[in-house]
Regions:
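Alpha-helical transmission elements in cytosolic ATPase-linked domains
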Residues: 17, 21-24, 49, 75
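Acidic-histidine catalytic/liganding microenvironments
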Residues: 25-29, 82, 193
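Alpha-helical membrane-interface segments at transmembrane helix boundaries
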Residues: 187, 191-193
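A conserved acidic beta->alpha catalytic loop
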Residues: 11-20, 66-67
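Acceptor/aglycone-binding surface of glycosyltransferases and processive sugar-polymer synthases
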Residues: 31, 35-39, 43-53, 58, ...
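Short beta-strand/loop segment that forms part of the nucleotide-sugar
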Residues: 3-14, 35-36
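Conserved beta-strand segments of alpha/beta enzyme cores
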Residues: 6, 31-33, 159-161
């Protein structure tokens, strides 16, 4: 099967050459579009902006550092097209390559948020997922100011199939998620749910 598709890159105020690369891609291929923030507004704002500008029947969220394996997309598309799901989500089965303290805090975060919340957020869940248009529209209808996408994905209640994969090292660059930034993000997630 062949599908029409577009790439929508969200440049979250990067200080490298990301915007130049996005512009070049757009000039070479009109299916490559981009949104460029004036400064870093954070992951949640980038996800929301991308979803808001998306137009497809199916929409995938994935990190551009290739820690979310693009090779899973054909399987994800097949599941949404042939099975009765509105979302195919991914989770890492291991945190191989991560500092042990970071893995410990991530595990504790999921344990705590699932204990105090009415919804379950899968341990190891990534933002990498493929969603139907009705799933995306439902997310966009939530006018949360302080968004926590992993919680919102679960809260909207659509049928989701989970695919597991081994942790993948990033292809280039370094994470901007310091321990403190992750800690504050987890506080936001807990207070949002």
């Amino acid at each position: 099967n062949h599908y029409n598709f577009e790439f929508l890159f969200v440049d979250d105020g990067s200080s490298d050459h990301t915007l130049d690369i996005c512009r070049d891609l757009n000039l070479k291929d009109s299916r490559c579009n981009y949104i460029s923030f004036s400064r870093n507004f954070g992951k949640e704002a980038a996800i929301y902006a991308g979803l808001e500008k998306s137009t497809g029947d199916y929409v995938a969220i994935m990190d551009a550092d290739l820690q979310d394996p693009p090779a899973l997309l054909p399987e994800m598309i097949k599941i949404l097209v042939t099975e009765n799901y509105d979302s195919v989500a991914t989770r890492r089965v291991s945190r191989k390559g991560e500092p042990p303290v970071r893995s410990l805090f991530a595990h504790l975060f999921y344990k705590l948020i699932n204990k105090i919340s009415d919804i379950e957020i899968m341990d190891g869940a990534r933002d990498y997922r493929l969603m139907s248009r009705k799933f995306v529209d439902s997310l966009l209808s939530l006018r949360e100011y302080n968004r926590f996408s992993k919680g919102l994905f679960a809260w909207v209640g659509f049928k989701t199939k989970w695919i597991e994969f081994e942790n993948v090292e990033r292809v280039a660059g370094e994470t901007k998620w310091s321990f403190w930034k992750l800690l504050f993000y987890s506080f936001d997630g807990i207070t949002a749910f």
